[in-house]
Design a protein with these regions (language model features):
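Solvent-exposed loop/turn segments at secondary-structure junctions
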Residues: 8-10, 34-36, 160-162
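Hydrolases whose catalytic domains are alpha/beta-hydrolase-1, hotdog thioesterase
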Residues: 12-16
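Accessory cap/linker subdomain of secreted extracellular hydrolases
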Residues: 18-20, 25-149
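Short beta-strand/loop motif that positions the catalytic acidic residue
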Residues: 155-157
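Conserved alpha/beta-hydrolase "acid-adjacent" motif
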Residues: 162-169
């Protein structure tokens, strides 16, 4: 079993190794963060307000299954984008639509990464709202478990996705 992905899905592939499941033999990580604090929120020690605000807007559109807003944000001019359905329901039509509606309702309560990240003035800041620290949502925090998985890791990055050049280097 293997996993691969870009950006979010790349981080998910890397987090898969934390479980140390013996069936997982390799992951391919492309353009993915390693340390959320230094790679995204405070690159170079300076709060990256524009990125965090934009990321929050993208998250809001994803949480609402809003294809039109996402398309406009990335500069796509798609005719009739407003009628695109977004994420497809899974399973039979009745249960799938019901599950999708519930998921969209559940996602309305997701946190505001822009507002919450502004509170994190130092690396080990503890968020009461999420009952967690930023390092716990970073692959670097789980390096021992990732290495103990024994899985092969193929990671590459570059200028393509923001500040992840350092993430690629720091991973080693």
């Amino acid at each position: 079993v293997g996993a691969y992905g870009n950006i979010y899905v790349g981080a998910t592939a890397e987090f898969l190794l934390v479980n140390k499941h013996p069936a997982v033999k390799a992951v391919v990580i492309r353009y993915s963060l390693f340390d959320t604090y230094t790679d995204i929120v405070f690159p170079g020690g300076i709060y990256h307000s524009w990125f965090m605000d934009t990321w929050n807007q993208v998250n809001r559109a994803l949480d609402a299954n809003d294809v039109a807003t996402l398309s406009k944000m990335i500069g796509l001019n798609i005719p009739f984008v407003e009628i695109l359905p977004g994420v497809k329901p899974v399973g039979n039509p009745i249960e799938g639509n019901k599950a999708l509606k519930q998921a969209l309702k559940d996602h309305q309560n997701n946190g505001d990464v822009y507002e919450e990240s502004r509170k994190a003035e130092y690396r080990d800041f503890y968020w009461d709202k999420w009952q967690n620290r930023i390092e716990k949502i970073s692959p670097y925090y789980y390096v021992a478990e990732i290495e103990a998985s024994g899985a092969a890791i193929y990671s590459y990055t570059g200028w393509y996705d923001g500040y992840y050049t350092s993430a690629g280097i720091n991973r080693y």
